[in-house]
């Protein structure tokens, strides 16, 4: 089996770099020829390596997103393994990958194939979540240097400012043959289960062909935080709308910033669907 290790040396303070030679030896002991390649986000990581059987990605959700989108653009679908080494590793967490690098590498080397869902919005793919509104674009507003220096504290600082400047987002939502209009403060469309390691969609499944959509109605900052807390403790507040669907259309009259897996997302209107079983994960 031929495999490619695509690693983001800037993710998680570069902790993957010191493990690369050991990972190559580990895969070789399982009959897998692994070629390491540092990711350059302006380039095609698969150039010259289109016929691989397995791609192992080391980084956070944004790194996995980048690689999956390049796979789709190339029209290739090798098995995909994930070594979580970024600040945000929600998708890797959803499939139960260990946070320790060598344990994750061993899980992949010994692993089997699992077909899981992937989200798609107007030609762009996401593995974990598409989102917009308060707190949801914190990752793309936080500078990489801050992430490397203080990790999650950088997200908290940016998120606190986000709470104080939140505003209503007028939405028209079409889902399961029904339409609704709502002033929202936050919307998350999950393929995975967590955002920022917070279990906002704990009952979501990666292999059911469905998206889990959470829409939080607009209110003041205190009430908004209270409603989200009630949702987290399964209090089912009326201000939180939970939809399950295979596809959804979302429109807005304002130009709100959106986010997919921690990276800048598309503009409105958006047609979002679940591509059931389209990822060949190895773990």
Predicted region positions:
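ATP/NTP phosphate-donor binding region
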Residues: 1-58, 65, 69-70, 103, ...
